[in-house]
């Protein structure tokens, strides 16, 4: 059996009744492969609409990125909307821009409707490390307001100093429609909501093959599902055996996270007084927030190719202490790594592998909100309205340069270039 990685989230997860392992042959309307946010959102949307849905998870619900991430509800996509407009044209940007803030709205609605206990707190900060980044945030504010986000505020150096007890930042953009959560508890709550709506969820049921027939047949180690439709939602943890075509268009990447021991109340009150989540504007960014039990959760850096580094704490602690030198000597209780799926365009990849087999993947670090949007869009498609799904599906999906052998060093070289620009402030 494959259990959750040792993390703060796993240690503080809400108790739930485990889901069974698939050990028979069953049939349904829709079979969803993957029990992360993409699969959970898709299954819940469809179950609410009355579909007979089966979700197959190879390990535990939220085992992958959905249960290991920074817990930040970051609006929009990994590519800024002005870049989307430049790359794909104003018509595509208009449609994609109209959906930028929908994923966060879906999450908040789910939390309220199903009373999911996941420590939701509103508000997120994008912090600038130099004047060039602050200018970019000013442009971001204007672009987001153009698409309907009215909950934005620019902060100057003195204002951000009141929000974050660090001397690193020249300013920030506060998005009050952002926020943070306990991501694994959100996943568990959504799985329970699926059960409540009549959906069937199976854990410890890794998919071994998908037959592209009509109906399709999805095989696991001990059972199989015959379904009218299949949704492939494994992302960085799908591997390259089940649907190898998807692996050619994307690359798993690892990010590292540490969580401190609980901090004294007086430290918490000064560190991030309004309990916002924070991410900086570097290409290889740092992100952090406080937890419900007064720990600092801090992540940063990327390992291309999804290798697990030997010493997560050694990689992350210099970043944490550069931001908060006053925490020198703080005890680290948890350290872990998790993989997200990167695309060359930094845009999500949606599409069809066959007339009845669909996929959604590659959120490139912006998956918490975008995955929830994805679930709504696939439910619209199966209901007969493919327009919004196809707004993503029509975007070109480029392979990484260098093929399987050279894509990692080529991508790392590019990241090093942009990191140097960040350090130089250009």
Predicted regions and their residues:
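Extreme N-terminal leader/targeting segments of oxidoreductases
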Residues: 1-30
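Glycine-rich FAD pyrophosphate-binding loop
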Residues: 48-68
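Helical element adjacent to the flavin cofactor pocket in flavoenzyme catalytic cores
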Residues: 142-143, 168-228
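C-terminal catalytic lobe of FAD-dependent flavoproteins
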Residues: 306-308, 313-423
């Amino acid at each position: 059996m494959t259990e959750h990685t040792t993390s703060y989230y796993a240690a503080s997860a809400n108790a739930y009744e485990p889901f069974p392992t698939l050990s028979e042959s069953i049939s349904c309307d829709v079979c969803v492969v993957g029990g992360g946010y993409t699969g959970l959102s898709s299954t819940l949307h469809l179950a609410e609409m009355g579909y007979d849905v089966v979700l197959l998870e190879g390990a535990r619900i939220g085992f992958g990125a959905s249960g290991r991430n920074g817990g930040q509800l970051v609006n929009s996509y990994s590519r800024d909307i002005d870049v989307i407009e430049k790359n794909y044209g104003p018509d595509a940007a208009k449609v994609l821009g109209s959906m930028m803030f929908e994923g966060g709205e879906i999450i908040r609605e789910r939390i309220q409707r199903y009373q999911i206990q996941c420590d939701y707190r509103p508000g997120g900060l994008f912090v600038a490390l130099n004047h060039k980044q602050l200018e970019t945030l000013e442009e971001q504010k204007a672009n987001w307001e153009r698409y309907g986000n009215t909950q934005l505020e620019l902060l100057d150096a003195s204002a951000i100093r009141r929000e974050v007890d660090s001397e690193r930042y020249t300013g920030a953009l506060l998005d009050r429609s952002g926020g943070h959560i306990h991501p694994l508890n959100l996943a568990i709550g959504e799985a329970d909501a699926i059960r409540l709506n009549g959906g069937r969820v199976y854990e410890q049921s890794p998919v071994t093959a998908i037959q592209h027939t009509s109906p399709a047949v999805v095989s696991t180690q001990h059972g199989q599902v015959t379904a009218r439709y299949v949704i492939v939602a494994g992302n960085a943890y799908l591997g390259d055996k089940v649907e190898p075509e998807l692996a050619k268009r994307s690359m798993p990447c690892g990010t590292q996270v540490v969580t401190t021991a609980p901090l004294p109340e007086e430290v918490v009150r000064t560190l991030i007084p309004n309990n916002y989540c924070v991410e900086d504007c570097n290409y290889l960014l740092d992100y952090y927030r406080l937890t419900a039990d007064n720990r600092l959760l801090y992540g940063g850096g990327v390992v291309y190719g999804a290798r697990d580094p030997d010493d997560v704490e050694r990689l992350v602690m210099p970043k944490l202490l550069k931001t908060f030198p006053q925490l020198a000597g703080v005890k680290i209780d948890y350290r872990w790594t998790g993989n997200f799926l990167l695309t060359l365009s930094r845009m999500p990849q949606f599409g069809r592998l066959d007339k009845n087999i669909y996929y959604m993947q590659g959120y490139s670090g912006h998956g918490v909100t975008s995955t929830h949007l994805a679930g709504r869009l696939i439910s619209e498609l199966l209901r007969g309205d493919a327009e919004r799904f196809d707004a993503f599906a029509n975007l070109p999906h480029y392979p990484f340069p260098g093929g399987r052998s050279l894509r990692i060093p080529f991508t790392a070289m590019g990241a090093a270039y942009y990191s140097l620009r960040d350090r130089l402030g250009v």
